[in-house]
Regions:
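N-terminal amphipathic, basic helical "cap/leader" segment at the start of enzyme domains
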Residues: 2-115, 121-122
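Small-aliphatic-rich amphipathic alpha-helix that forms the alpha element of a beta-alpha
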Residues: 74-75, 117, 131-160
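Short amphipathic alpha-helical segments
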Residues: 102, 130-131
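Short acidic/His/Gly/Ser-rich catalytic and metal-binding motifs that mark active-site loops
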Residues: 125-128
């Protein structure tokens, strides 16, 4: 191999090494200038857009702490005149869920679920003006959506 060819090969190897170093530097700087965490608004929107109804479940247990978190999220929903016309029934008894699945035609998925939370509207709750709450269905719907979004954020499958 002549000296001119050796020089070209060494120059090419050095150029490739320099290019690789520059690419690494640019990538490192780009990563350093990007925020470590996504803005809260982006995280919330991503959670809203990724939420979907899940009707087929794994056998992964759902802890009492997770169920409590879901109920807390539901209870944080807004309500008309702050009536909070809801009751939450947490069901984690497999036998009870299988019985409900057998009786409720649109809840067959309960037979496979590890737990369930029933959101019940309490129509006897009175508004501040002493009249029965007219918004109980809307209020319970908002609570249910909070619960579903929290389940999505926790990596749990859920359905309305």
């Amino acid at each position: 191999m002549n000296d001119a060819l050796k020089y070209k090969i060494v120059s090419l190897v050095l150029a490739i090494g320099l290019l690789a170093s520059l690419i690494h530097l640019v990538v490192s700087q780009k990563q350093a200038t990007q925020p470590e965490h996504k803005p809260a608004a982006e995280i919330v929107m991503q959670n809203i857009l990724s939420r979907k109804s899940v009707r087929s479940y794994t056998n992964r247990p759902v802890s009492r702490a997770q169920l409590d978190t879901l109920v807390r999220a539901a209870m944080a929903a807004p309500t008309g005149m702050d009536t909070r016309p809801w009751k939450f029934v947490v069901i984690d008894n497999k036998n009870a869920m299988q019985q409900l699945a057998a009786k409720l035609p649109r809840a067959k998925m309960l037979a496979e679920a590890q737990a369930a939370i029933a959101v019940c509207g309490d129509m006897s709750v009175l508004s501040k003006d002493g009249k029965p709450s007219r918004n109980w269905m809307l209020d319970c719907s908002a609570a249910t959506e909070n619960l579903l979004l929290q389940a999505e954020a926790m990596g749990l499958g859920a359905v309305w």
